[in-house]
Swiss-Prot record:
Its main location: cytoplasm. This is Actin, cytoplasmic type 8. PANTHER family: ACTIN. Oxidation of Met-45 and Met-48 by MICALs (mical1, mical2 or mical3) to form methionine sulfoxide promotes actin filament depolymerization. Mical1 and mical2 produce the (R)-S-oxide form. The (R)-S-oxide form is reverted by msrb1 and msrb2, which promote actin repolymerization. The lineage of its organism: Eukaryota, Metazoa, Chordata, Craniata, Vertebrata. It comes from Xenopus laevis (African clawed frog). The keyword ATP-binding applies. One of its GO terms (cellular component) is NuA4 histone acetyltransferase complex. Keywords: ATP-binding, Cytoplasm, Cytoskeleton, Hydrolase, Nucleotide-binding, Oxidation. It comes from the Eukaryota.
Amino acid sequence: MAEEEIAALVIDNGSGMCKAGFAGDDAPRAVFPSIVGRPRHQGVMVGMGQKDSYVGDEAQSKRGILTLKYPIEHGIVTNWDDMEKIWHHTFYNELRVAPEEHPVLLTEAPLNPKANREKMTQIMFETFNTPAMYVAIQAVLSLYASGRTTGIVMDSGDGVTHTVPIYEGYALPHAILRLDLAGRDLTDYLMKILTERGYSFTTTAEREIVRDIKEKPCYVALDFEQEMATAASSSSLEKSYELPDGQVITIGNERFRCPEALFQPSFLGMESCGIHETTFNSIMKCDVDIRKDLYANTVLSGGTTMYPGIADRMQKEITALAPSTMKIKIIAPPERKYSVWIGGSILASLSTFQQMWISKQEYDESGPSIVHRKCF
C-alpha cells in the first residue's frame, strides 16, 4: 500500500463516462456515467436520507425518479457546479482518496477554451487543495497508449469526435478538426428510428436503455447499400433484445443504420463530413512531408469506435480518398474505450514527466494562467 500513497491520480472526464484511477495501473479503477441527477418529486418518506443530488451509477440506478444532467457537453465542461460534484464523487466515493495528498492528471478536449483549463486548474488547487496537477489533451494520451508519438487520432466518445494529427508528441492545432457527432447523437438517432418502428422511448431514463441497445447489437456495415438489401430480403440480420420490463424487441437494419450516421451525417440532418472524410481533411491540413506517417498511423480511440467493422470500413473509405499508392493503416486497439485513461496512466508514471507537474506553489505565485505555460 505504501507506494500507492504517492501515486498520481488520473481522471479522464468524458462527456458520457468518467474514467478514474491511479497512475501506473493498466486500467481505470472507477468508470461511471458523468451525470448528476436531481429528484423530480418531493420526498415523502421522512428519515429516508434522501439527497438533493446523486452522481454517477447511483444517479443511473435511481434514474426513474430523477432528472439527469450531463455537465460535460461535446467534450467541454458547461456546468462547473455539477462538475465539482463529479470530481468530489470521484475522489471521495470512487477512489476513496484525499485529493490533497495526490498529484492529479486531468484530461481535456482538443481546442478546449483557455478559460476552461484555467477553471479546472483553479478548482483543483482551491477547492480540492491538490499538491500538483496537470492537464493533458485526450487524443495525445490515446496515441501514447498505442505506443506511438506520431500519428492521427480519431477520437470519438459520447459527446464529440476529434481528428487530431500529432507529430513527435505535439498536437498540430491548425489541423485538428472537431465534429459534433458522437455517441449521444447516435443514441438519439436510434431512439428516433426505433420510434418509427413503433417502440416508444422518450424520457432521459429510457434514453439510457437505448444507449445499451446501441452498444450491444449494432455494427458498421462494410457496404451500406448491400447490407440494406440483405436486411430487406431476409431476416438473417435480425437480433432480439430484451428490455428491462421483459418485453422483447426485434431490431433489423437499425443495427447498422445507427452507426452508419458516423460516415453519413446527413442521416442526422447534419451537413458535416463523415468521420472518414474528416480524418482525411485533417491529414490534408498537415505539412505534405508528414502525411505519409499519418496515413500509416491512424489510431481509433473512444467508446464510439468500439463498433465491430469500423476499422475495415475506415480503411476502405480512406483508401478511396487517399493517393492510390499510399500505405494506409488503421490501428484499433482492443482497449481503445479506455486508451485516453491508459495514456494518462503511462504519462503520469514516467520519471521524465515528474518535472512537468504544476505545483501548488507555482499556482499560488502565478494564478490559473500557469496552465497555459506548463501544459501544451
